[in-house]
Structure formats: C-alpha cells, structure tokens
Swiss-Prot record:
NCBIfam families: rsmG_gidB. Specifically methylates the N7 position of guanine in position 518 of 16S rRNA. SUPFAM superfamilies: S-adenosyl-L-methionine-dependent methyltransferases. It is an enzyme of class 2 (transferase). The lineage of its organism: Bacteria, Bacillati, Actinomycetota, Actinomycetes, Mycobacteriales. Belongs to the methyltransferase superfamily. RNA methyltransferase RsmG family. GO terms for cellular component: cytosol. This is Ribosomal RNA small subunit methyltransferase G. Its EC number is 2.1.1.-. Keywords: Cytoplasm, Methyltransferase, rRNA processing, S-adenosyl-L-methionine, Transferase.
Amino acid sequence: MLYRSISCPKGTFFMTTPPAAAEIFGDNLEKAIAYHESLATDGSVRGFIGPREVPRLWDRHILNCGVIGEAMDEGISVADIGSGAGLPGIPLAIARPDLNITLIEPLLKRSVYLNEVKEALNLDNVTVVRGRAEEKVVRKQVGLVDIVTSRAVAPLGKLATWSLPLVKIGGRMVAMKGSSVEEEIERDAKEIRKAGGTDIKVYTVGEALLSEPTTLISIRREK
C-alpha cells in the first residue's frame, strides 16, 4: 500500500492510494501519485483546487478522469479544452500514453502550471496551448483532432460550439457531465445541431473500478 504525507492548513494527514489507481494507470501509477501530490499541495496553494477537495482528489477528480480513456481508440489525437489544472487531460495522458493530447487553457497561471506538470512527469504525449478553444489562432495551432474532451467547462450547447470546430468530420466531442445531462440535451438540441453535432450518446465508464462511474456525453461532428 502506498502512502503520501500531505501538508494542509489544518495539519498533516496520510492519503492511501486507492487500489483502482493501479488498474487505471498501470505502469504509470507513480506519475499519477506525483500528480495527486502536486494538486494537493501546489495546486491547492495556487488556488486551482479548493481545500475541501483535497481529501477527495483521487475519487472525485483523478480516477474519474483517468477512466475516460475507455471511450477512446488507440493512438488518436485529443484536445482537452478549458483544461484548468489538467482535468481530465493529465490523468488521461497518464493512463493512456498512446494518445496525443493537447491541453487548451486560457489563463496564464494555469497554463504555466500545466507545463510544469508536463515537464515534471515527463509527459511526452502532452502539448500545452494557451488560449480559448473558440479563438481562430488556437484552432489554427491545434488543427483538427479525433476527440475533444472537457469537464465542467460550460453548458452543453455552448460547449458544442467550442468543441466541434476542433473535431475532424466524423470525430467526436466527449464531455464529462453530471446527472442533468439529459435535460441539457433537450434544452440545447438546436444549438448542438447548428454546431454540426449529431448522434448524441450518453454512457458511463469505469463501472468495474469506481463506486461512482463517470458519465460521458458523446456528440459526433457531421459537418
């Protein structure tokens, strides 16, 4: 069993690396642990992670992001928009080193942190781009990818207008969503179609590993 001592304002405590982490991250488990430590300490101090989230980083943030690789074919290109502190892009890159992942983040302090994590963990399959997904300069720099991911970025309709232009025709946006996803689909259906989206699917991943599986919505770019 692996333990790490994490310093926080209320003292020091030990966190156990959950057994599921070894299943999800395999040979890259130590990188996942190092990322967890970075979020719990540096990430919290710099305001990327709220103090209340630190004790539940594994379950609510790292593991549920790592399992989204179940929805992706081998060796594809992925763009993670509004990457923030690297969720879901960094756990995905650790779990799936075969993927080529671009992290798109507009804020300087967060993009600096993402580059620090990339270098510290030797994530050769990660590229960091500072900017917004809807900006022409970013779209030109990133090009077209197979899948665009996101987590807690925007309402579904707006998310589709930002994500789908980065996706190859026939590719997909795959967004992490909560229990209200069906309501979002109904509310934003016209906006999704206008953005060129079709073939909407909702499914879960990580059922065999997580107590609360991750819910994903997948939308294919038709035009």
